[in-house]
Curated annotation (Swiss-Prot):
Name used for this protein in its record: Transmembrane protein 45B
Coarse class of the protein's main subcellular location: membrane
Organism: Mus musculus (Mouse)
Transmembrane portions of the chain: 7-27, 49-69, 95-115, 117-137, 149-169, 183-203, 215-235
The organism's place on the tree of life at top rank: Eukaryota
């Protein structure tokens, strides 16, 4: 959808998943830290399956929104010797590949004894690459600011595709996972930024899309967005660490208390048995 909602919708999807990853991966990392066996528990596998289902649901919602809005193509690709709403079709194609990625996530953890390890990462990398590929040819013959604000997103997309591809070999690498998370959060916030710049809501004045100062500001703004994404990842990582440390200390305190009660009970029993003998 070539409007504000058409950019806010995917931006919200990517932002939700990115925020979830910024909590999930630190939890997973600290849980497995120090353990010899990195195999996922049943509960963790269930979470991965649910995440795949949610990704697939987001993709279906996105496709339906692109196709069946009032001015959408309604599944018509070619009509009366001309293409029908190709921009909506490009967005639908992007959602389609992320839906396939969600399905592969579910298949990977439902049939882990059959599916080769790393195939879920391959499909996710492919989905991100396809998104970047579509965006590269999405803005030809557009005003300079429109082209520039979309092209900036390509750096994050292709960077994420390379990072996810490395995860096929270096699976469960916390650095790569957090890097991918930061780029996904960046992608989510930047979709919102594109919507505000190209389709200003609430009756705000439109941006001059040929003004070089606007292009310079948007470039700087992209860097700020990524800094915010990194801060979000760092803050959530720290919060997860503090939370788990507190839970661990409380659990250790309870264990020490139980052991102390047991030792006191044993000592009292010994005293009683000694007095009985006397």
């Amino acid at each position: 959808m070539a409007n504000f909602k058409g950019h806010a919708l995917p931006g919200s999807f990517f932002l939700i998943v990115g925020l979830w990853w910024s909590v999930k991966y630190p939890l997973k990392y600290f849980h497995h830290k120090g353990l010899k066996n990195n195999r996922l528990s049943r509960q963790q596998e269930r979470i991965e399956i649910i995440e795949g289902a949610v990704k697939t649901l987001f993709a279906i919602i996105g496709i339906l929104a692109e196709q069946f809005v009032p001015d959408g193509p309604h599944l018509h690709l070619y009509h009366e010797n001309q293409w029908v709403k190709l921009m909506n079709w490009q967005h639908s194609t992007m959602y389609l590949f992320f839906g396939v990625s969600g399905l592969m996530d579910m298949i990977t953890y439902l049939y882990f004894h059959i599916v080769p390890l790393g195939l879920d990462r391959v499909v996710l990398a492919m989905a991100v690459f396809i998104e970047g590929f579509l965006f590269y040819f999405h803005v030809h013959n557009r005003p300079p600011l429109d082209q520039h604000i979309h092209s900036l997103l390509l750096f994050g997309l292709f960077g994420a595709a390379v990072s996810i591809s490395l995860e096929v070999i270096l699976r469960d690498n916390i650095v790569l996972e957090l890097f991918r998370t930061s780029l996904l959060i960046l992608q989510g916030t930047w979709f919102w930024q594109i919507g505000f710049v190209l389709f200003p809501p609430f009756g705000r004045p439109e941006w001059d899309q040929k003004d070089m100062d606007n292009i310079m500001f948007i470039t700087m703004c992209f860097c700020w967005h990524y800094l915010v994404a990194l801060c979000i990842v760092a803050i959530n990582y720290s919060l997860v660490y503090c939370f788990l440390t507190r839970v661990k200390r409380r659990a250790e305190g309870e264990i020490i208390g139980i052991q102390k009660l047991k030792s006191d009970h044993t000592y009292q029993s010994a005293l009683l048995s000694g007095s009985d003998e006397e």
